[in-house]
Amino acid sequence: MKITRRHALQGTGATALGLAGLNFDFSRATAQTNVKRGGTLNFAISAEAPHYDPHASDTYATLHLAGPFYSTLLRFNLEKFPQVEGDLAQSWQVAPDLMTYTFKLKPDVKFHDGTALTSADIKATYDRLRNPPQGVVSTRKATFGDIAEIQTPDPLTVVFKMKAVNASMLEHFASPWNVIYAAKDLSADPASPRTKINGTGPYTFVEHVKGSHVAGKKNDGYFKKGLPYLDGFKGIFTLQAAAMLNAVQGGQVMGEFRGISPAERDRLVQAMGDKIRIQESSWTLALLVCFNIEKKPFDDVRVRRALLMAIDRWGGSNGLSKISTLRSVGGVVRPGSPFATPEAELVKLPGFSKDIKKSREEAKKLLKEAGQENLKFTLWNRNLAMPYTPAGIFLVDQWRQVGVEVEHKQSDTGAYLAHMNSGNHDVAIDFTNLFMDDTSLGLSKFLSLSRSPENRSRSNDPQLDKLYDDHIRERDVEKRKALIRAFEKRLFEQAYQQQLLWWHRIVATHKTLMGWQMSPSHNLGAQLEGVWLNA
C-alpha cells in the first residue's frame, strides 16, 4: 500500500488545490450574510507566554497571545481538517518526487509597519527555523532540517529544494508555529521576535500588560478583504481555573480556547443552560513522564523503567478522565489515529501492562538491582490545574506504592519551561503538543537533544534518530508503520520519556460567539479572523 492519493493531489494538481483554498477563504467570508461586524472579543488565556516567538515555543500560551498578529505560508482548513489551504500562499506546486516545493505568494500583503511582504521574508523565516543563528532557539529545527536550499526567483515566488524526501512536508508548511517574520527585522536582530511583534495577521499589536492581558486591534490593511470582523480582542490571563470559570459564567470573557475539565463543563452547563456552547473532541496532546538522564540515578535505565512500570495507566485513565482533561491510554501516536499502536500490542510494552500487581513487583525488583530501594526525588510540574495538578498528584501516589518518595513542585509556565530546558529537573511532567497526527511531527520531540531542543530527557540516541529518518522517507504505509513501532519500542525500552495519558478536549464558549471552529488541536485557529459577536 503506497501513500499516493494525497501526494497526487499535492503534485501536479497542487496549484488547483491551492487556488481552491484561496476561494474557500473568500467564500467563507462572504457566505455568512448575517455577520455582525465590530465589537471587541474578550477571551481567557489560562497561562501567560514566556515570550512572543512561536518559533522558539511549544506552549499554546504563545500562540494564543501572538497568533492573531501573524500569518503562515499555509494553514489547516479546520472545516476539512487535516486538508491544507493557503494563508500567504496563493498557490503551490509539489514536484512528483517531493524534492521541490514552489509557492506563489499573494500580492499586496504588508507587515504592520507598512513593509511589503516578499519571498525574501519567507526565506529569512524558514532559514531561521531550519538553521537558527547563535542565541536563537528553533524547536522545529529537526523538522526543517531536510531543506537544502531556499530560492527566491522573484518577489512573489519562493522555492524550497529538499535534501531528501519528507512525505509530510506540505503539512509542516501549514504549522501554526511557522509564523512569517520580516527579513529586515531578523537581519537587524535575529532574536527580536521574542520581545517585538510585527506580523501580517488580521490584528495589530496594541499592548501586553504582564499578569493582566494582551490586546490587539483590527488590521485595516489586512490582505484578506472584509476580514477580520471584530474591531479588536483582549486575551485576559486567568491562571486560576476558578477565576476563568467565574469570568465565563459572568460574561467577562466569551470563552477559553484551550479546554476545560468534565466537572468544569458540567458546572457551566448547570449555571448557564442554553447560553453556553460545549464542543468536544479527542486531542493531539499528551502528558509525558520525562527523566533527565544526565542526573543520577536517572542515568540508569533500570530506574527509569521501574518508575514507568509502577504507573497504572489503565486505572488512572478511568479515574482521571472524570476529574480532568486526561483520558486515553496510548503510545507515541494519538489513540485512534491511523498509525496508533493497537491495544493488544501496546500492553506488551514497558509501562502499559494491565497486570499492575505484576508490573509493580518487577519495578521493585529493578529498583533493588539498581540500589535504589529508598529512592527520593523531586517531580517538576506546571501550575496549571488542568490537567497538570491532578497528573502530578496521581504520579506521586503511584510511585509511593513501590516505596519511592516524591516531592511535587509546581511553577508558572515560564519558570517551568526554563527549568526543564536548562536541564535542572530530575523528573518532570512534560507534554507533547501537536497540531496534527503525522508522526514526522509527533516523533521529532524524542530525537537526540543535538537535533531536537524539545527533548527534555536530554538523551542522544542514534538508533532512534535513524528510525525517525527512515520513517519520514518511507512512502509505503505498512513499512512506515513498522518503523514507527520500532521507534516506539526503542523509546519505551530505554525509558527516556513516555506518554502518561492523552487528553480529551472540551471547549465552552458563549453562544453569542460565532465563527470560532473546533479542532483536535488547541494550537489551530488562533488568528481569530473569522470570529464575530452576535450581540
Features from the language model and the residues they span:
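Extracellular/periplasmic solute-recognition and catalytic clefts
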Residues: 26, 149-151, 206-217, 234-295, ...
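N-terminal lobe/hinge region of extracytoplasmic solute-binding protein
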Residues: 44-96, 127, 196-199
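Acidic-aromatic pocket-rim loops
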Residues: 57, 273, 331-332, 338-339, ...
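Gly/Pro-rich hinge or "lid" segments in bacterial periplasmic/extracellular proteins
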Residues: 75-79, 174-228, 232, 240-242, ...
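Extracytoplasmic/peripheral linker and loop segments enriched in polar/acidic and small residues
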Residues: 99, 356, 405-416, 443-511, ...
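Surface-exposed binding/hinge segments that line
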Residues: 104, 138-185
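Long beta-strand-rich cores associated with HINT superfamily self-processing modules
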Residues: 507-535
